[in-house]
Amino acid sequence: MRMSLLLAASATALLAACSPEKPAPAAEAPKAAIGSFGLDLAAMDTAVKPGDDFFNYVNGAWLKTFTMPADKTRYGAFDALRDKSESDVHALLEDMKTTPPAAGSVQEKVVNLYNGWMDEAAIEARGVAPLKADLDVINAARTKADLIKLIGNIEYASPIGLYISPDPADPTKYVVNISQAGLGMPVRDYYLGKSEKFDAYREAYKTYVTKIFELIGDASPAASTDKVIALETKLANVHWAPEQQRDVQATNNPVDRAGLKKMIPAIDWDVFLPEAGLGAVQNFVVNEKTALSEGAKLLDTQPVDAWKKYLAFHIASDNATSLPKAFDDASFEFFSKTLRGQEVQRDRWKRGVQMLDGLIGEGLGELYVAKYFPPENKAKMDDLVANLRSAMGERLKTLAWMDDATRAEAVKKLGTFDPRVGYPVKWRDYTAYTVEAGKLFENVRAGRKFEWNRQVARLGQPVDREEWGMNPQTVNAYYNPLVNQITFPAAILQPPFFDPNADPAINYGAIGAVIGHEMGHGFDDQGREFDETGKIRNWWTPETNAKFLEQTAKFAAQYDAFCPLEGVCVNGKFTMGENLGDLGGLEMAYTAYKLSLGGKEAPVIDGFTGDQRFFLAHAQVWRAAIRDDALRNQVLTDPHSPAAARGSIPERNMDAWYEAFGVKEGDKAYIPPAERVRIW
């Protein structure tokens, strides 16, 4: 494997001799950023048996002593890197103050957006005036047709969601997708759940909605609140649950315009679509069709006035952070403090950086990469990605449950994976995004409108395979099945995930598992529905499909049994894709690591073998503390399992982990060999 040397400490250079008689000593090799070889040994609780509770064995000392910052709802390796990314971007913004940017440049737009965000006095001075035009338009609605015009406008809340993506039937072109939308709380369970906690959330939401109506000067805030919540509860009743939304086949319903009118007749699409800039579009993909058809009927069964109150509330709530402090505080109190347990608001500059990421993120990313991303890191990651792909290819050859016909298709798909590392080869053009100094509210909305118009303009054009769905300064990675691409932004390519000076086992267990995770998504419960071109196509034989489903059912049961809070258990079906990515990624990374050794034994370092260091690194990148409300929110809304599950359950299904730590029958984490899930 080519990557073994690249993952080791880079070669050292000799200093020039100080004198002919006495040569200077050789420079020390660069050291790992964390510990002596890339692992935080002080975080471990060695009083815990690894076979009883591996996550706490690796992270227990840290978990016992860590104090959650008041402005955080969770904190771990991802969060620490996100803090660093924010600080790096903030430093860029501070540098811009010393050199006025060129007129019309991306830098000027960034500066004007950020300065407008930071000028709280100007925001307070404008009061609710920026909302007046929207509230007047909403108040003027009298008929269902008026409502349809409003909900067709992407600037207003709507039970009809729109997004544009490559077409699952032909991924070389774009298609308009129509999906369920319109709730003020995260998902349907917050409206329909039966527990004291859900009752408390609903009461807090009622308080929040009432506060917003008071702030916009509504004549009857309490009555208006009742109308909004009643309407949203009816909408929640017809929404699909998150696990249903993962069904690729059920959410792929291609229709032409006539078929759309028949499928969802309560909407006058000839009125709705032109308002969204889609008047000429003839073909669509409908996602949750029953939720959409039943939700649209509420336009007939609910009074026009109830919808007007709904729209008025949401135009204020959705833009609360661009309005005076009273709006911002109310939004924080409910969405951050009540729903996720955050004690205090984050510093305004940090939220300003977050705002810029959402509106002009690639423009900021170009500046970020130029200053903070070493070109050599991209080359090293490119090689590591190639190593993981080779490891996946080796694993595909030996999968006993997969027949040859399906294996050939899987190999073909793996061979066409398109990895992107660091940053895009071309940067987004923000010329059409107009930013005016001193107008935060308008600038934020203009940014959203710019992005929607940019997407609409792509309809009828070939799919742009060079486009990125994340900014370089984002600490994350993703797989897109419609283009068969895996993407690793620059910001995640730092310790503890990637450190060219760390022990190779650490890099393979950390960033290697992340790379493998994204590759694994190409073959998870959703990704396996797409072929090597990104088209939805069944390339599985019935026999292999049955064996896959048998294994995934066993895997789901392991996560169903993971209950981090009383009455709060992971939904193994909802989190299946991410769980499969975690297991497959760890398996691939381990295979790549062993291949990199070329048949030799890894050295023992600080008493740990290479295999042990590999698994320790994986569990340590998932080290995280999280508040109870945030954890409950994650289980309900996020297809990723909690960190403690991600850093322990995959290991329990790998024979190599048992061998590395001497885990045996009788240990609490032990799973009999016949019950271990063996997929990728």
Residues of each region from the PLM?
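Sec-exported extracytoplasmic/periplasmic mature domains
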Residues: 55-63, 83-86, 90-98, 115-123, ...
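Active-site-surrounding "flap" and adjacent substrate/cofactor-binding loops of secreted or lumenal enzymes
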Residues: 30-35, 48-122, 185
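Bacterial signal peptide processing site
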Residues: 19-21
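Intrinsically disordered, low-complexity linker/terminal regions across diverse proteins
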Residues: 28-30, 263-266, 285-289, 346, ...
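Bacterial N-terminal signal peptides that target proteins for export
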Residues: 1-7
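Noncatalytic, helix-rich "gating/capping" subdomain that lines the substrate-entry/channel surface
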Residues: 96-387
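C-terminal motif of bacterial Sec signal peptides marking the signal peptidase cleavage site
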Residues: 14-17
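N-terminal low-complexity, Pro/Thr/Ser-rich intrinsically disordered segments
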Residues: 23-40, 44
